[in-house]
């Protein structure tokens, strides 16, 4: 019922998006920043796996001899504080400059002036940020979703129409283990993009980071077996990590619901502490941990806080995607 009421608003939103895209399609307002740009984004609100994909791209570029920087918008940040994604990237990619600002052109100018050795920029969530010219435009498609069921905001989750997929240089299917009909997904992407996906990937917990008053230790997934957990996932799809924890043998005794990017208030921290009295540990995502670490005193918390080490695992096409990315970057640098 609500979706039906919101459809007129979706039509208006679609008209605004179409007008904006038409302007950028002509090249008006597009800025060449002087550095090769690799954009990684999606068509929908909510998580499709951009953070692990951005980190994969950064590591792959470093391994190939490049010196990347990351520019992102910085959703959910408070004035004077870095965003969840910025903190997560900085923690995972030591030495990689990470700049958060709604003005990505200004961020890249700062990168060029303050980090002159950087030779490529990764735009985190850059598909709709069309003001920045890019050599590679990777679009992530969530394998957990059925493409033809998606609607435009606000009645649905689409930031722009599915036909916008055509402007991507490469499409990558994430969470591909959830694709019920691979042939149908492949055909749908070909019809919208003109080519099949360049790669398919899943998201896997490689290990766990256990935070306690004594510090942080890295342990294998087997550590979860038999543990009673309180979970709190401030992400778009909390069912995924909860299911992974239970698949690893953990028992979820309490779940604290939270919206995507939600900060931790003192009342919520107290609620988690209270629930954890009947648990062995609290499980949160990396995005949650960078916020929780600001407000929790591990010396008084009582139980460990566990953060999964999430990685991107390609089931097909990693070499193709990397080759295309490196080729485009090298052409721009010559």
Label each residue range with its predicted role.
Residues 1-36, 328-332:
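A transmembrane-helix-recognition feature enriched in membrane-embedded lipid enzymes
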Residues 66, 72-193, 200:
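Phosphate/Mg2+-binding loops and adjacent switch elements
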Residues 204-208, 258-263, 301-332:
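Short, flexible loop segments at boundaries between secondary-structure elements
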């Amino acid at each position: 019922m609500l979706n039906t009421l919101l459809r007129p608003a979706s039509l208006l939103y679609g008209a605004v998006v179409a007008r904006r895209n038409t302007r950028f399609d002509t090249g008006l307002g597009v800025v060449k920043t002087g550095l090769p740009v690799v954009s990684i984004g999606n068509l929908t609100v909510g998580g499709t796996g951009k953070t692990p994909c951005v980190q994969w791209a950064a590591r792959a570029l470093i391994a190939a001899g490049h010196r990347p920087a990351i520019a992102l918008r910085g959703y959910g940040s408070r004035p004077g504080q870095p965003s969840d994604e910025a903190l997560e990237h900085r923690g995972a990619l030591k030495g990689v400059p990470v700049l958060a600002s709604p003005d990505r052109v200004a961020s890249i100018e700062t990168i060029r002036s303050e980090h002159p050795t950087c030779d490529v920029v990764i735009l985190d969530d850059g598909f709709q940020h069309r003001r920045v010219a890019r050599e590679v435009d990777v679009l992530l498609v969530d394998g957990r979703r059925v493409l033809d069921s998606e609607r435009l905001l606000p009645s649905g989750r689409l930031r722009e129409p599915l036909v916008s997929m055509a402007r991507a240089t490469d499409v990558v299917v994430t969470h591909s283990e959830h694709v019920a009909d691979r042939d149908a997904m492949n055909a749908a992407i070909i019809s919208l993009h003109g080519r099949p996906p360049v790669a398919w990937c899943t998201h896997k917990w490689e290990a766990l980071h256990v935070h306690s008053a004594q510090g942080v230790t890295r342990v294998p997934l087997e550590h979860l077996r038999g543990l009673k957990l309180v979970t709190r996932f401030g992400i778009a799809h909390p069912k995924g990590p909860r299911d992974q924890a239970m698949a690893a043998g953990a028992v979820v005794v309490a779940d604290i619901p939270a919206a995507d990017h939600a900060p931790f208030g003192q009342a919520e921290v107290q609620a988690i502490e209270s629930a954890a009295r009947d648990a062995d540990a609290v499980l949160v995502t990396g995005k949650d941990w960078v916020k929780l670490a600001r407000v929790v005193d591990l010396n008084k918390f009582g139980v460990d806080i566990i953060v999964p080490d999430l990685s991107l695992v390609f089931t097909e096409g990693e070499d193709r995607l990397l080759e295309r990315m490196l080729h485009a970057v090298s052409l721009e640098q010559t």
